[in-house]
């Protein structure tokens, strides 16, 4: 019993440490292009600041991602979100995250907690921008569920689930004579008449939406 008490006490002490984010230790400076340069005393401070910058720039899209990852997108967009909600249930995102969450390092969990605090604080100060109240408060586990769904979709497994429900699964769906590819072109300096070499690639990333890239400069005094 004594060991159990000590373990519980240690858990709450660690949680308390993780939750101590002082916004005064965080500075967000945007350059002429709007790119946020985020300064903080610790990695957790910077994560909190990054969450705040994300929300300033596109709170709606980030919420939609988390709604899908937690199986409640249909509460926002109706039947159009039912497919994503169904996939989240089929792949058992919640059960998988609950099972594997404790395998994450304490340092990483601290970063997740700090980021979620930044999101929750923004939602608290701008409640009119919240899409679905049930999504909040955001927790590290809710964030991890969205990451799990993203990995599933990035590997094309969502299309397989769709084929299964439509009874349209083919034995050769992994291999095809008409497989798509991508191009990368390297331009030598001698070819372009400049003392530079260029590499043209297609990152297959859209300019907006949940899979678009985001530029930020993170500076932590922690290292």
Residue ranges and their predicted role:
Residues 22-223:
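Substrate-recognition/specificity elements adjacent to catalytic centers across diverse enzyme folds
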Residues 1-21:
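Bacterial Sec-dependent N-terminal signal peptides
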């Amino acid at each position: 019993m004594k060991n159990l008490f000590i373990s519980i006490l240690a858990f709450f002490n660690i949680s308390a440490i993780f939750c101590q984010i002082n916004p005064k230790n965080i500075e967000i400076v945007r350059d002429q292009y709007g790119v946020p340069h985020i300064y903080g005393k610790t990695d957790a401070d910077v994560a909190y600041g990054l969450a705040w910058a994300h929300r300033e720039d596109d709170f709606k899209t980030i919420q939609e991602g988390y709604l899908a990852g937690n199986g409640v997108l249909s509460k926002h967009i109706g039947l159009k979100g039912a497919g994503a909600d169904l996939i989240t249930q089929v792949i058992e995102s919640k059960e998988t995250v609950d099972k594997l969450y404790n395998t994450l390092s304490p340092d990483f969990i601290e970063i997740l907690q700090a980021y979620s605090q930044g999101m929750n604080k923004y939602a608290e100060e701008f409640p009119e921008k919240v899409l679905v109240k049930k999504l909040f408060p955001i927790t590290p586990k809710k964030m991890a569920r969205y990451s799990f769904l993203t990995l599933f979709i990035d590997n094309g497994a969502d299309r397989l689930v769709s084929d299964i429900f439509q009874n349209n699964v083919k034995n050769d769906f992994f291999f095809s004579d008409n497989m798509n590819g991508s191009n990368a072109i390297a331009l030598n300096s001698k070819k372009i008449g400049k003392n530079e070499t260029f590499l043209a690639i297609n990152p297959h990333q859209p300019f907006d939406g949940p899979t678009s890239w985001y530029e930020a400069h993170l500076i932590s005094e922690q290292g």
